[in-house]
Amino acid sequence: DSLGSAMDDTCRRNIKRAEEQIQSQTARLTNCSAVPAVLEKAYFDSVGRAAELGNADAQVCYVQGNFSIEISDQQMERYKDNARNFIQLGLERGDWRIVNLLAQDTNVHISGFLGSVSSRSPIDILRMNRLLRHGATGGYAQFLDTNAKDLAIRLGNKAQVDSANSWAQEEYERHFHNSPILNSEPEDCKEAELHEETPGQ
């Protein structure tokens, strides 16, 4: 009996020790999983601050909206307001990166926050495609033309296609005639560089 009792005590101690180890490891894993979320939130906040201060690269990253975080409805409304403002500023400074973000087919390519402010209309995508085409050359120009043909077929309305071309011509002459020639798709957000610049913000 005493032997059995001793074995029971040993067993209970082992079980308790195992439970404590499980709890400890669970806590460590929980803390580890929280670290990326904290860093991502800090990145979101720092990019937003830099964008509001006029950093063009930060504005592109902010508009692109590839943030793996959950935010409140109020924060999302603020993102939308800021992103629309940064889009307008990007167009006014002739920033091809902003145009390229808006030229993506939102049903296929856009994820993250950008889908909340980017139009899902083929006519708007075509406008941005045609604007890019004014600055494009070589294989990239051919790529844009192919996409434009597909968009025109989806629209099925020559008047809308003509309107998109006219808008793109006017916008190019107004803001983009001095922008660099495009031999390939413009780079969007240089996320790695921004991460390096804002680790402690």
What are these regions (language model features)?
Residues 136-201:
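Terminal, low-structured helical/coil segments at or just beyond the last alpha-helical repeat
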Residues 17, 38, 64, 194-197:
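Secreted/processed peptides and extracellular or luminal domains of membrane proteins
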Residues 7-14, 21, 51-70, 86-110, ...:
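Short helix-capping/linker turns of helical repeat alpha-solenoids
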Residues 35, 50-51, 75, 90-91, ...:
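Hydrophobic/aromatic side-chain positions at a characteristic register within alpha-helices
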Residues 84, 116-141, 166-169:
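TPR/TPR-like (Sel1-like) alpha-helical repeat modules
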Residues 1-45, 68-85, 110-123, 145:
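Short coil/linker segments at helix-helix boundaries
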